[in-house]
Amino acid sequence: MKTGKFIVIEGLEGAGKSSTHQVVVNTLTEFGIHEVVFTREPGGTPLAEKLRYLIKHEAEELVTAKAELLMLYAARVQLVENVIKPALARGKWVVGDRHDLSSQAYQGGGRGLDRHLMTTLKNAVLGDFKPDFTLYLDIEPEIGLARAKGRGELDRIEQQNLDFFHRTRERYLQLVQQDPNAVLINAGQPIELVQQDIRKAVQKFIEENV
């Protein structure tokens, strides 16, 4: 049996990950790929969902940047080992809403955590496991946050100041440029053009890998 592929959707708040998810699924379906597993990070297993709540909601004490990072990696390893890897081994494709790039950008860039710590933790938890393909939806933080606010109440991370999101975006851009398996999508375009670019990128990946 062929192993499946792991596609990840990344981006700041309000970049359009939810609508991108549907475009990816529709494109996979057009190519006859129906066995798809959907994941989100943090979350995706009973323990990971509990950690998601702790990460995203205000706590009775200060949540330090390192504690936040460690909770994210605890949730991630549960998801990877218990859901993603088994699904890929069964030949299913996995479409993920965020993965390790989010931690590298948000905690490494936004929080300013030490790059050596970030790399060491990533290698210890994930080893050589990584997505086969990443779609990064790039958007100006001001626009993305305005969209996020329009959806309702912001969570603990979404409430960070604008400088935090500019640092996060800057790190995202650096990492995407270094990753040959990542594609940058201009999410500031009209939605029709964004979806068109996503479909083309996914189609190209499928044609080259199936």
Swiss-Prot record:
One of its GO terms (cellular component) is cytosol. Keywords: ATP-binding, Kinase, Nucleotide biosynthesis, Nucleotide-binding, Transferase. SUPFAM superfamilies: P-loop containing nucleoside triphosphate hydrolases (SSF52540). ATP binds at G11, L12, E13, G14, A15, G16, K17, S18. It catalyses: dTMP + ATP = dTDP + ADP. The keyword Transferase applies. Coiled coil: none annotated. GO terms for molecular function: ATP binding; dTMP kinase activity. This is Thymidylate kinase. It comes from Histophilus somni (strain 2336) (Haemophilus somnus).
